[in-house]
């Protein structure tokens, strides 16, 4: 019994409206302080919401439970250490009443606070997601603006290149015009030179014919001298006529030889000059061919530039059409984006509403779980009561052994308690069944909500896919968008006026200033390269100019040489005339001397011997001259061949000149067409230069604004970087905290699920044990009833036996009395 008296405290789960009064007996070892400590520990562990009234009682004689006052309609149960007194709700007397509504709601408040915190976190996360989406949109807009700026800069560069190419083409056209004028002048010079060459060739031919004639005359004179000398050798007697003939022939020979030598010298000089002129002409022709190639190349380049200009104009027109189309597409895209944002806001509102409903359902489910936990605690209390009932049954058995009356009373009390407990168990079972039905209904509602949530998620996925498709379409449209320069400037003005997006705009401008500076540096490098190329072209032009000057100097030298040749020819003609006059004078003087022949014959006779000696020497000289004449004939033949070659070359040169004249005419026509086209291009270029000048002025203004904004950008970027770092740190900390909380919640959910499963299993095991114990109690009650019946039968037997005995004794005593009485 002592071991039984040190049993654990009692747990009782009661309805909200039933007041509870508990009496606790003082054991040998328990104290009120210890009971209070146990009560506090139980209150902290959320076990039972029952207030105990601790009363220290003195030991009183045991009173049977059946003899209590009838007025008190309370249910009492007394054990070795506790006394349970339950008053129904109808009774007006309430001692230490406790209701469940008076219990603490700290847990519910904490759960509500946690739910509010989670809702706030979800709202903050949604706001962060919205800010991130806005940042992504702004980044996309910045990328679009950067792409448009790049495209505009590329178009500007292309326009600058085209203007530079046009300037170069104009410069080349001017150079070509100058070259063509020079070619015309050179053509005039070449015509004069050809006439002069023809005159020189005629002079050479006349000189050659004269040289041939002089050679033939010299040969005749030599042949006549040979015949006279042979005749004189045969006759060996010279007359005065023979002497005169010899002297005449001698003089004629000398004259012919002198003229032949002079003509040979002049021919050699003329041939040398002719060779030099031919070389100069070949050089000039080569230079003309080079110039013609340059002209052809320049014409081809002009045609290419014209084609490029036409292509550029077509591209500009196409770009203008595309820009208009892209503007329309941008408008449609903006309308679509607005509609998408409205749909998105509607969906977000629906999601928030569904999340709020889910949170409400989760709170209701948690409340149901709490009620289940309370029911489990009540079941545990009932189990404890069953344990105590078992103990009580054991005690009742012991009491039955001691006394039949106490056993009967306790049996009746146990029957009453069992009935009450059975009623309570039935009520609890019905309450548990109702709770399970409510749980199933809540689960069905929760499943419906989960299904609705999954449907909404699917709808969100479809909407997101549609949004992604629309974003892709918008991206394609944005890739195609190439806005004009004025539109960009207007956008820049509008974006500068926007105060809300000032920081993002500053970052965008900072990001756009860096590639602009890089492009400016590239443009400066390209300008330097173009300047170097222009310098190279200028050097080439100077070289061409120097070559042209050289050719002009050479032509002037050739003209001077030709003038010198003309002067020399005139001088030679004058000298020839003078020599002829001198020869005439000599012949006249000789004729005058021949009149004095008889005086001279004597002298001639003396001179004949000398003449014979001289003849021998002349014969030797004649042999040498014949050899020289053969060489001269060969040379003349070679010169004739060369003259034929020169004639053929002259004819080919004339044909080439004709072709060149035709080409020059074609070039003049092309120049006229190109001049008209250049005038048109100049007009177009002037208009474009005006527009470019205006754009440059705007760009300068914008560069100034950008420089002023860049300074502000640096400060704003630093602040933005700090804020971004702080926000990133906060976001990372929030994400970590959220992840940790999510993990904790998941672990708590898993724990609660495992606990629920364990509690369900324990509940099932407890129900099985309870049923088995109820069956045992029923069996024991039947046994106790059978023992009671047997005891009653035994008592009746004893009564009957005692009655019989006492009746027999009474019968036996009655006759003795009767006998003594008389």
Curated annotation (Swiss-Prot):
Residues 113-418, 452-490, 516-796 form a coiled coil. Keywords: Cell projection, Cilium, Coiled coil, Cytoplasm, Cytoskeleton, Developmental protein, Differentiation, Flagellum, Microtubule, Spermatogenesis. One of its GO terms (biological process) is regulation of cilium assembly. GO terms for cellular component: centriole; centrosome; cytoplasm; microtubule; sperm flagellum; spindle pole. It is found in: Cytoplasm, Cytoskeleton, Microtubule organizing center, Centrosome; Cell projection, Cilium; Cytoplasm, Cytoskeleton, Microtubule organizing center, Centrosome, Centriole; Cytoplasm, Cytoskeleton, Spindle pole. Residues 26-45 are annotated as: Disordered. Self-associates. Associates with microtubules and forms a fibrillar structure partially linked to the microtubule network. Seems to be a major component of sperm tail outer dense fibers (ODF). ODFs are filamentous structures located on the outside of the axoneme in the midpiece and principal piece of the mammalian sperm tail and may help to maintain the passive elastic structures and elastic recoil of the sperm tail. Belongs to the ODF2 family. This is Outer dense fiber protein 2.
